[in-house]
Amino acid sequence: MKVKRVEHIAIAVSSLKTSIDFMRDTFGLPLEYEEQIGQTRLAMLPVGESYVELLEGQGPESGVTRWVNEKGPGLFHICFEVEDIDAALAELRAKGIKLRDDRPRIGHGGARIAFIDPAATGNVLIELAELPQRHHAATS
């Protein structure tokens, strides 16, 4: 599998607006875009060739809401950009690595994403993302 870079670090937050304001006012990170995916509202803030992704759950059934309620706000996952997510998932399956997503699904900015089960990674949630050409990072 070819990992191109750390695409983003995701942080689960209680208030997206408060967190965006903090990142902007404290670190000078601009908001590139906000997006709603299912029961999660997210914001992408560029840092060099990577992003900070802020995630706020939008209801009690949201995985982010459950995470924040159980563990509090904080680091949620790391995302690696890969060239070919289908090949990456096939390679992981061949190595016996347990996946949360057997097939890619659509995530932030239209990226094809999949998560590895944290039980296989030392309890770190890892996302793989294949970015479309029109994606924010692909046009940078």
Q: Over which residues does each language-model region extend?
A:
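A cross-kingdom feature marking solvent-exposed beta-strand/loop segments within repeated
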Residues: 5-7, 26-32, 36-39, 59-76, ...
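Vicinal oxygen chelate
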Residues: 1-2, 43-44, 89-140
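Short, charged/polar surface micro-motifs in flexible loops or helix N-caps
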Residues: 48-52, 59-61, 85
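Hydrophobic side chains in well-ordered alpha-helices
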Residues: 19-22, 88-92
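N-terminal beta-strand motif that seeds the catalytic metal site of vicinal oxygen chelate
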Residues: 1-18, 73-82, 130-140
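Short, structured motif recognition centered on aromatic/hydrophobic residues
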Residues: 6, 13, 20-23, 45, ...
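The feature marks the first
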Residues: 17, 29-30, 49
